[in-house]
Amino acid sequence: MKVGIMVKIERFEGYSTMVEELEGMKFIINLPVYWKIDEDSMKNEKWNLPVKLLEKVVALIKEGRLRPEEGEIFEKENGETLVYGTKLTGFILLKPVLQGIDGDSLQIIPLYKEEISFARRMGWRRLRNMFKYLTPEELSFISPDRYNIITDIDGRRNCL
């Protein structure tokens, strides 16, 4: 199902935010300054991950397969990845990390299969608590190669 969405881009000091509104809720994805958001770049798979995620969220909600509430997790079937070239297999909806975002917003945070498995075994709140080991930038900004809080233990952050 192809869903047409109207993404709003808000620019802040140090980052940009893509916002899609549905059913009175804002779904947001924060992007680092270097992220290319011009029309030509959005045609490139490397840069259109945020738009694809927003389209997926809207489609899943309209299909009744995802509730627009904190803690909702989506995982692609059969180990498929969200986008070619990444190991991200799903996402979670959480209250926004950055200050100044209103209460009717949910942030889309892409997840690795190990993080999804952890959330299903231990609960999404435990996963959210694990995110404290990431810097605000690592968690807040979308990144196809983000640190995996379950498998990537580097001594600086002893997650488990």
Model-derived features with residue positions:
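Acidic, proline/glycine-rich low-complexity IDRs
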Residues: 1-13, 22, 27-160
